């Protein structure tokens, strides 16, 4: 039986689907001291492609990225469109939606996932300054009780829409 070798990598990110990303960030900062949070709008033109079950889609999500130690926390507010996030909210409510694994080569990781029997539910990419960066959510919940996201980080990121707390 083939297995997904990317699962032998460390978890780099924990992703939460939240109702209001600004309020959630404020709570993390005020109650736990977690910050600085970098906000991005995941929609075109930042994302160069967006697919849901293999078909092009449009969605808009407000994302905040922060760190708890070495682990990146991603807070996601679905603003518009049918996505894996709205699927999660319908099934589970708000909360931990995925675990993210950083991969050096997305093509190789996706081939590995397919060999192990996993397909891409939703993906997007092109969010780096050089048009690189790619994320792909896999249909792992059926076996692992959570969705795994493969993340090939961009070499350089765009400046965030905002940072919380604001720099003095």
Predicted regions and their residues:
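Glyoxalase I/VOC metalloenzyme domain signal
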Residues: 1-12, 16-38, 53-119, 132, ...
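Conserved catalytic-core motifs of GNAT/GCN5-like acyltransferases
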Residues: 38-42, 122-127
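Short Pro/Gly-enriched beta-strand edge/turn motifs at strand-loop
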Residues: 44-51, 117-121
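A cross-family detector of function-defining hotspots
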Residues: 127, 135-136
């Amino acid at each position: 039986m083939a297995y997904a070798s990317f699962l032998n990598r460390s978890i780099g990110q924990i992703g939460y689907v939240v109702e209001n990303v600004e309020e959630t960030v404020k709570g993390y900062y005020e109650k736990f001291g977690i910050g600085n949070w970098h906000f991005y709008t995941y929609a075109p033109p930042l994302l160069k492609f967006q697919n849901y079950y293999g078909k092009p889609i449009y969605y808009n999500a407000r994302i905040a990225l922060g760190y708890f130690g070495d682990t990146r926390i991603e807070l996601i507010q679905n603003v518009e469109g049918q996505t894996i996030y709205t699927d999660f909210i319908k099934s589970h409510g708000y909360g931990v939606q995925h675990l993210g694994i950083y991969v050096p080569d997305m093509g190789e990781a996706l081939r590995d996932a397919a060999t192990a029997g996993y397909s891409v539910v939703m993906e997007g990419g092109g969010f780096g300054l050089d048009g690189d960066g790619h994320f792909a959510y896999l249909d792992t919940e059926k076996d692992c009780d959570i969705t795994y996201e493969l993340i090939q980080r961009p070499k350089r990121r765009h400046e965030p829409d905002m940072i919380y707390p604001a720099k003095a």
